[in-house]
């Protein structure tokens, strides 16, 4: 079972590196993706700055090394909806079911916080992720008008 906790400033550098490494490998280190998000270098400040609306879970290995994470934040494009953001794992953590556990943690936190729906956006290069989202009950929707990451081309929603 995966060990995870809320992000701290000590995690910022490690999780930013994991996000950037994944996006570089997928040729998504381009404008319109999380690669260029201004808060990427300081995710703890962004998520902990509004703790009643946002949360970022850091996944840890058996020696407490950061191996990934997932964020949840308010999404203003759909009523009572949170957005699941920046679900990424280090290569050493892939293929072990950790993404599924992180999604479950995100869903649980969002539901407990009062959100009724969970939205996410992704890119067609992330085929493994899209299969996971669909398997976990996310339904593909049309692109919402308020999308900030213009490069994303697949959009999903799930009722909690």
Language-model regions: role of each:
Residues 2, 6-85, 90-91, 103-105, ...:
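Acetyl-CoA-dependent GNAT
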Residues 101-117, 132:
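Conserved acyl-CoA
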Residues 25, 116-160:
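C-terminal "cap" of GNAT-fold acetyltransferases
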Residues 26, 96, 112-116:
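Short coil/turn segments at alpha/beta junctions that flank glycine-rich nucleotide-binding fingerprints
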